């Protein structure tokens, strides 16, 4: 369950008559009401208090209804479904005094809803967030997919352990221009960049990083969490500067490359291993694995040589391929 808190402010006051705290502040004057979602569920009783020293002449409205919902400094709302959520406003004499927005977070059969993001099902089911790091600097990128294109808002926070909840900072989520097709359906891809402030590339990780994405679609709130060690999400950039050198009196060529600029240094400590493969029009040769940055291969006409990299000492993900034409 999401950490719960009851926030009291001078701008608006949200009270609960339920003995279990089931409402908390997402941002200023925006509150999430957590609901058990089943037929005839009792819902949650929420008491809204208008931010004004006045006691008389106050009326309440909602963006869900054209009617006046009540009068007085407080309004009691029984929140059972999305029709009970939305923005509540108190007025006096045509003047808006304060507003409170109620969002719903559904729980069905003890499980929080996950309707907004696409389950990518890799490396396991319920994998909504994917994260990668190009090196051990503490910088990483996360992304997720959604079929929803409007009325959508994301916020991201991250930490490594409870002792330093602000030790990892994340920027704003941005919509990628990349089109992602899954099962003949197009999805929007969102990405976010994060950085651990006190990262030590050579240090052994003892606590995982946790990333939480909060998603709001219309009046629905959901959150998604991914927990990992940087070493488990490493995916180097492809090797750079691939070059071919013909060998005298031989059908072979020497292909050479360099470490990617983004990889951690020194390379004597942060070492990579490489995979080399000749790829023709109709077939691919077997892969060669090596630690050095050159190899001798037979390069056929109209073929290409491709090289990828991964961490030599830890079973990281392989990089994308870098390639050079034989012709």
Swiss-Prot record:
Query: Where is the secretion signal located?
Result: 1-22
- InterPro entries the record matches: FN3_dom (IPR003961), FN3_sf (IPR036116), Hematopoietin_rcpt_L_F3_CS (IPR003530), Ig-like_dom (IPR007110), Ig-like_dom_sf (IPR036179), Ig-like_fold (IPR013783), Ig_sub2 (IPR003598), IL-12 (IPR050676)
Which UniProt key words apply to this protein?
Cytokine, Disulfide bond, Glycoprotein, Immunoglobulin domain, Secreted, Signal
Q: What is its main location?
A: secreted
Which residues are connected by disulfide bridges in this protein? 50-90
Where does the record place the Ig-like C2-type domain? 23-106
Q: Name one GO cellular component term.
A: membrane
State the Gene3D superfamilies in the record: Immunoglobulins (2.60.40.10)
Q: Which GO terms describe its molecular function?
A: cytokine activity; cytokine receptor activity
Per UniProt, residues of the Fibronectin type-III domain are 238-327
What are its GO biological-process terms? natural killer cell activation; positive regulation of activated T cell proliferation; T-helper cell differentiation
Q: Which residues are glycosylated?
A: 223
Answer whether the UniProt record assigns the keyword Transmembrane to this protein: no
Asked if Secreted is a keyword of the record, the answer is yes
Among SMART domains, the record links this protein to:
IGc2
Where does the protein end up? Secreted
Q: What does this protein do?
A: Cytokine that can act as a growth factor for activated T and NK cells, enhance the lytic activity of NK/lymphokine-activated killer cells, and stimulate the production of IFN-gamma by resting PBMC.
Q: Spell out the family assignment given in the record's similarity comment.
A: Belongs to the IL-12B family.
Quaternary organization: Heterodimer with IL12A; disulfide-linked. The heterodimer is known as interleukin IL-12. Heterodimer with IL23A; disulfide-linked. The heterodimer is known as interleukin IL-23. Also secreted as a monomer. Interacts with NBR1; this interaction promotes IL-12 secretion.
Record's protein name:
Interleukin-12 subunit beta
């Amino acid at each position: 369950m999401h950490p719960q808190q009851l926030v009291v402010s001078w701008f608006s006051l949200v009270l609960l008559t339920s003995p279990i705290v089931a409402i908390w502040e997402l941002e200023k004057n925006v509150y999430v009401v957590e609901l058990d979602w089943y037929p005839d569920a009792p819902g949650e009783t929420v008491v809204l208090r208008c931010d004004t020293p006045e006691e008389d002449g106050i009326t309440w409205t909602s963006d869900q209804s054209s009617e006046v919902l009540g009068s007085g400094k407080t309004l009691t709302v029984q929140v059972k479904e999305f029709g009970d959520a939305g923005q509540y406003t108190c007025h006096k004499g045509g003047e808006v005094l304060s507003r409170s927005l109620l969002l719903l977070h559904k729980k069905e059969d003890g499980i929080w809803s996950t309707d907004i993001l696409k389950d990518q099902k890799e490396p396991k089911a319920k994998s909504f967030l994917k994260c990668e790091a190009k090196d051990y600097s503490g910088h990483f990128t996360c992304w997720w997919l959604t079929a929803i294109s409007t009325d959508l808002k994301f916020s991201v926070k991250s930490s490594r352990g409870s002792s330093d909840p602000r030790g990892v900072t994340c920027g704003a989520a941005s919509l990628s221009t990349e089109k992602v097709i899954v099962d003949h359906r197009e999805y929007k891809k969102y990405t976010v960049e994060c950085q651990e402030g006190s990262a030590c590339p050579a240090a052994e990780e003892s606590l995982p990083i946790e990333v939480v994405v909060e998603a709001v679609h219309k009046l629905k709130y959901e959150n998604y969490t991914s927990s990992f060690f940087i070493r488990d999400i490493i995916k180097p950039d492809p090797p750079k500067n691939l070059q071919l050198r013909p060998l005298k009196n031989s059908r072979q060529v020497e292909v050479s490359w360099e470490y990617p600029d983004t990889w951690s240094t020194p390379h004597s400590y942060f070492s990579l291993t490489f995979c080399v493969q000749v790829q023709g029009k109709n077939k691919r040769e077997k892969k060669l694995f090596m630690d050095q940055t050159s190899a001798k291969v037979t390069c056929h006409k109209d073929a290409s040589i491709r090289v990828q990299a991964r961490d030599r000492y830890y079973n990281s993900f392989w990089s994308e391929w870098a390639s050079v034409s034989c012709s």
